[in-house]
């Protein structure tokens, strides 16, 4: 099998967005007299399109508007309930470009349910579709957007702590935001500004590993408390993953998961930035050097980082036209495959984004203005609660409930702790959370 695919053990399905009335309801819903499962007054529950430790993801439909939505169902008796926390974080984020809309949260029979906007494929799915390499133009269009996306999250006093390609989705094909890169899954997010004191959280060590090992920062491997710098470093690792097709620390074997994560961290530290970014524009190395030198408390200069890539983009003569590498390819969706027509890219959106780029270029490199908090729109509900819910220096905290994805072929995620020596060969550093079922690959078979 092709080497590019060797280290890719992923499973799980997922993601979401809906339409209709927004709300947080305590009114119980469930099966109607016709036997149709309903969430709230107007969302009909359909087929299963994803699963994980949180429960299930279902395709839904707003019966008032006939628009498709995604519905996350979590058993009320869940050992580690987290759906209400995710809802609260979405509310805290409010309205912003590339932030999924949440339309409803409340009980549904024996489940808690959250209705979200239905989105398109994840960057990991699109990476597969493009033979596991993105062009420089596509990576730069992604990077420019995701720096802004992370700046917005940070402006809401949250750090994300879960960077991975599966957590960044394009809009649903045919939607006006179809080419916008969205950020999803705030199950590992945390408030870095104490809501009581309004001060930055203190620097601490001996913390549990939180996030996805393939992309997490070097300081996270060292057990240091995460802050804004770590989100940006993880993004840098993901950008190089897209350009290279793989990272030097993928596919490492060990007798235990703890040893494997130690090896990943050791290899990251031992890989010079110049080697990691060899044969690619110097701006990629400059980005990583900058974010790795940030102080724990320091506010990153997002404008400087964006300008690095927008200037490179201009020098290459690229147009920010949303002509990604996957344009023209057939995109899978939970409601049928869709041909991605280049003509669907909105000229108006392209002009708007170019205007934003020009605006960014005109700002000085040392400008450190925060994202305008006035963008929040009260009718867009999103949310999650900031809480460092997972302890233990040997635990790698993964999406939604702090457990590891060991490429479970049935549920997509596993409850195995990091200390468990079983299935090391099929353990993946990533946690899949795209909105539709992905083809499962077993690392054991690939490494034979």
Swiss-Prot record:
Keywords for this protein: Acetylation, ATP-binding, Cytoplasm, Kinase, Nucleotide-binding, Phosphoprotein, Serine/threonine-protein kinase, Transferase, Wnt signaling pathway
Domain of life: Eukaryota
Residue spans of biased composition, Basic and acidic residues class: 1-16, 348-370
Sites bearing N-acetylmethionine, chain numbering: 1
Main location: cytoplasm
KW Cytoplasm (keyword) present: yes
Span of the signal peptide: none
Domain Protein kinase: 43-313
Residues annotated as the enzyme's active site: 162 (proton acceptor)
Biased composition (Polar residues): 395-417
Record note on quaternary structure: Monomer.
UniProt miscellaneous comment: Triazolodiamine 1 is a commercial name for 5-amino-3-([4-(aminosulfonyl)phenyl]amino)-N-(2,6-difluorophenyl)-1H-1,2,4-triazole-1-carbothioamide.
Function field: Serine/threonine-protein kinase. Casein kinases are operationally defined by their preferential utilization of acidic proteins such as caseins as substrates. It can phosphorylate a large number of proteins. Participates in Wnt signaling. Regulates fast synaptic transmission mediated by glutamate.
Protein's UniProt name: Casein kinase I isoform gamma-3
Species annotation: Rattus norvegicus (Rat)
Taxonomy of the source species: Eukaryota, Metazoa, Chordata, Craniata, Vertebrata
Gene behind this protein: Csnk1g3
